[in-house]
Amino acid sequence: MATIHPTALVAPGARLADDVEIGPYSVIGEHVEIGAGTTVGAHAVLTGHTTIGERNKIFHFVSLGEAPQDKKYAGEPTRLEIGDYNVIREFCTFNIGTVQDRGVTRIGHHNWIMAYVHIAHDCVVGDRTIFANNASLAGHAEVGDWAILGGFTGVHQFCKVGAHVMTGISSVVFKDIPPFVMASGQPAAPHGLNNEGLKRRGFSAEALSALKRAYKILYREGNTLAEAQAKLAPEAAKHAEVQQLLDFLARAERGIIR
């Protein structure tokens, strides 16, 4: 049976695994489902059609599953889905999706999300990301696996942040950031490959060399995006990492940072 503090309010329809812990004064809504081993701190509010996986640590004053900050929202039963083994620190706010897009805001597994982070409606966050304090995603944004967003990074709506990206503090992201790239500034601009992060994650010397060549084609040779894509195609045929970059560029509807 779940451990629920006497001051917490848990709606009758909420579904809690047997070893879930709910802290003082927290509120758990009617359509919330919480998986095994998840702990919820004090004064947290989990509402809406929200599904939370296993072994998550949700700290004090977090708000999950509230209505999107979108004037078009009219009470539709859209969703928030959170995976397993995430750490969600104090005062984070994650909103449900909207019917104008995918209808769900989705966060993956093993993410480390620091205090005051905002993840807006219809965002998609992959696995093993790090969001430093006060990073914010506007609606419909996407963040790939292993990305690291520096403190106070702001991501414009519909922007995509690729896998293994790292942004500097207070970066303002108006366009898509390709995978493996470091970015910083207002607006964010490319500052080389995330070499140290890629080494720590076990990328081979061959893969790193291929990505360095790809970065040079994309950013150092004065190519247009179309020209860079054409030049990257032969490298992509030989290296999966370059193919991942090329696939991202094909989806970059807002253009990429330059």
UniProtKB/Swiss-Prot annotation:
Pfam families: Acetyltransf_11, Hexapep. Pathway: Glycolipid biosynthesis; lipid IV(A) biosynthesis; lipid IV(A) from (3R)-3-hydroxytetradecanoyl-[acyl-carrier-protein] and UDP-N-acetyl-alpha-D-glucosamine: step 1/6. It is found in: Cytoplasm. Keywords: Acyltransferase, Cytoplasm, Lipid A biosynthesis, Lipid biosynthesis, Lipid metabolism, Repeat, Transferase. It catalyses: a (3R)-hydroxyacyl-[ACP] + UDP-N-acetyl-alpha-D-glucosamine = a UDP-3-O-[(3R)-3-hydroxyacyl]-N-acetyl-alpha-D-glucosamine + holo-[ACP]. GO terms for cellular component: cytoplasm; membrane. CDD domains: LbH_UDP-GlcNAc_AT. Coiled coil: none annotated. It is an enzyme of class 2 (transferase). It comes from the Bacteria. SUPFAM superfamilies: Trimeric LpxA-like enzymes. GO terms for biological process: lipid A biosynthetic process. One of its GO terms (molecular function) is acyl-[acyl-carrier-protein]-UDP-N-acetylglucosamine O-acyltransferase activity. Its EC number is 2.3.1.129. NCBIfam families: lipid_A_lpxA, PRK05289.1. Homotrimer. Involved in the biosynthesis of lipid A, a phosphorylated glycolipid that anchors the lipopolysaccharide to the outer membrane of the cell. Belongs to the transferase hexapeptide repeat family. LpxA subfamily. This is Acyl-[acyl-carrier-protein]--UDP-N-acetylglucosamine O-acyltransferase. It comes from Thiobacillus denitrificans (strain ATCC 25259 / T1).
